[in-house]
C-alpha cells in the first residue's frame, strides 16, 4: 500500500502522511464484537470469563489511546509538513502479564487466566519507535496506559 501511495505522490503530486499505528484502544469502539486486547480483557475480567494467554505472558506490545491518535490526526490536518511515514504508538512496551495486572487494578477483580502454548507467529516484542513523529510534529501521547484503561473501563461500564 505504501508503495502505491508514494507512486501517486510522484505521478500526481498528491501529498500524504502514512501512520503506522500500534495497538489502539479506548472509548467509543462501537463494534458489536469487542476488538482489541484491552476491551476484551476488561470484558472477560468483569464477566469472570477466562483470559487466554499464549505463552507465559511475557509478550510485549505497544498500546496507544485513541484520543492521542485523534489529536495527532488533527495536528496533521493543520500543518504544511507532508509526505512522511511515521510510527504512532506510546513508544513503551507492556507485557501481557503487566497489562492484565493494570486491568485488574482498575476493575478491582482478579483475572482467571488460561495459559496456552505460545503461537509460532507471535513476535516476542513489538514496540514502535516514535522519534520521527515526535521530532516532526512535536507529538507525544498524553494518556498513560493506566489512565486509558480506566477511561475505557468506565466507558464500557456505562454501556451495560
State each model region's role:
Residues 1-17, 22, 45-47:
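Active-site Tyr-X1-5-Lys
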Residues 2-6, 10, 39-42, 71, ...:
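Conserved active-site helix of classical SDR/Rossmann-fold NAD(P)-dependent CH-OH oxidoreductases
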Residues 26-40, 49-50, 54-58, 66-67, ...:
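Glycine/proline-rich active-site loop of Rossmann-fold NAD(P)-dependent oxidoreductases
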Residues 69, 73, 88, 99, ...:
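Non-catalytic, hydrophobic alpha-helical segments
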Residues 95-107, 148-152:
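PAPS/PAP-binding and catalytic site of the sulfotransferase fold
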Residues 96, 117-132, 143:
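Active-site loop of classical SDR/Rossmann-like NAD(P)-dependent oxidoreductases
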Residues 145-160:
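Amphipathic terminal alpha-helices
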Amino acid at each position: 500500500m505504501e508503495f502505491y501511495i508514494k507512486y501517486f505522490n510522484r505521478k500526481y503530486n498528491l501529498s500524504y502522511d502514512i501512520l503506522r499505528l500500534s495497538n489502539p484502544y479506548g472509548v467509543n469502539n462501537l463494534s458489536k464484537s469487542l476488538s482489541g486486547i484491552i476491551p476484551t480483557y476488561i470484558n472477560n475480567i468483569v464477566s469472570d470469563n477466562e483470559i487466554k494467554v499464549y505463552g507465559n505472558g511475557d509478550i510485549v506490545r505497544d498500546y496507544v489511546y485513541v484520543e492521542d491518535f485523534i489529536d495527532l490526526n488533527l495536528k496533521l490536518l493543520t500543518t504544511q509538513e507532508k509526505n512522511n511515514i511515521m510510527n504512532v504508538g506510546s513508544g513503551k512496551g507492556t507485557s501481557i502479564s503487566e497489562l492484565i495486572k493494570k486491568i485488574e487494578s482498575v476493575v478491582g477483580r482478579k483475572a482467571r487466566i488460561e495459559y496456552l502454548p505460545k503461537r509460532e507467529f507471535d513476535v516476542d516484542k513489538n514496540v514502535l519507535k516514535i522519534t520521527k513523529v515526535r521530532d516532526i510534529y512535536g507529538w507525544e501521547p498524553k494518556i498513560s496506559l493506566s489512565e486509558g484503561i480506566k477511561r475505557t473501563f468506565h466507558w464500557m461500564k456505562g454501556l451495560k
